[in-house]
């Protein structure tokens, strides 16, 4: 009797248009089509990295409810058009670009001035329409991100957004616009109870549908890997203990092991100094304040510690260790 699960594969990628494709995967064991299809869909829509305009400064505009002389669109519609520009950044996480246009005509994304490592996927996208004498001058900040971040969230967290005239935008970073999936019947030899997963994916052009599938699968694998290693996972206490600095065993030994004179040893115990680790954290001045412990006893203690590579006034983390008896 076969107990191993069938391993699916991508058997077809059918282009349906620009940045739009149908991806077919089979065979899946019964039920796995919906299990993986739903998981991939959620990751594709929520967890993919993309780029979006996040802030804009427009010459002569103080807030988004303004109008601009010579520009047919009001500022609200202008901002909506700017958010429709699809950017792709290479080897950087953010950039500020400029747009300066005057005179009658249509302003498109192609009019934006770009550095060499920034690309616009939809250069024909219309941003504004200028009439005779119209002028548009703006600075646009583009950032890398994930998911959807409302502008009011960024306003509270970013001091720079309080600058007068700087408008913070709602940012939709997701490069995947639409995802749907269907599960159909599949057959392998005599088995007819299998699933075929058909995914319909449309992106904004920053990544291809095939690459979107690959990235979403890697995200799922990374998130699930912790469960695969569950048996060997350390407890929180064990992990904390492993991270804690290791204490030199000599510091756990009693001060009696230093073979000090009876006078010096008794003075230390009177001050609750029972272990070498307790002793090395004391300074010379602190020890000299100990009753009946004079300069001669102090020099003796310093010499004995020095012979073991230790000194007074040392700092120890996590001292005393748990379970150390006094």
From Swiss-Prot:
Gene Ontology molecular-function annotations: DNA binding; DNA-directed RNA polymerase activity; protein dimerization activity
GO cellular component: cytoplasm; DNA-directed RNA polymerase complex
Reaction it catalyzes: RNA(n) + a ribonucleoside 5'-triphosphate = RNA(n+1) + diphosphate
InterPro entries registered for this protein in UniProt: DNA-dir_RNA_pol_insert, DNA-dir_RNA_pol_RpoA/D/Rpb3, DNA-dir_RpoA, RBP11-like, RNAP_asu_C, RNApol_insert_sf
Gene Ontology biological process terms in this record: DNA-templated transcription
Pfam families tied to this protein: RNA_pol_A_bac, RNA_pol_A_CTD, RNA_pol_L
Swiss-Prot/TrEMBL keywords: DNA-directed RNA polymerase, Nucleotidyltransferase, Transcription, Transferase
Tagged with keyword Mitochondrion: no
Span list, region Alpha C-terminal domain (alpha-CTD): 247-326
SMART domains: RPOLD
Sequence segments annotated as region (Alpha N-terminal domain (alpha-NTD)): 1-231
Keyword Hydrolase attached: no
EC numbers, comma separated: 2.7.7.6
Enzyme class: transferase
Oligomer status and interactors: Homodimer. The RNAP catalytic core consists of 2 alpha, 1 beta, 1 beta' and 1 omega subunit. When a sigma factor is associated with the core the holoenzyme is formed, which can initiate transcription.
Role noted for this protein: DNA-dependent RNA polymerase catalyzes the transcription of DNA into RNA using the four ribonucleoside triphosphates as substrates.
Domain writeup: The N-terminal domain is essential for RNAP assembly and basal transcription, whereas the C-terminal domain is involved in interaction with transcriptional regulators and with upstream promoter elements.
Protein name per its UniProtKB record: DNA-directed RNA polymerase subunit alpha
Gene this chain is encoded by: rpoA
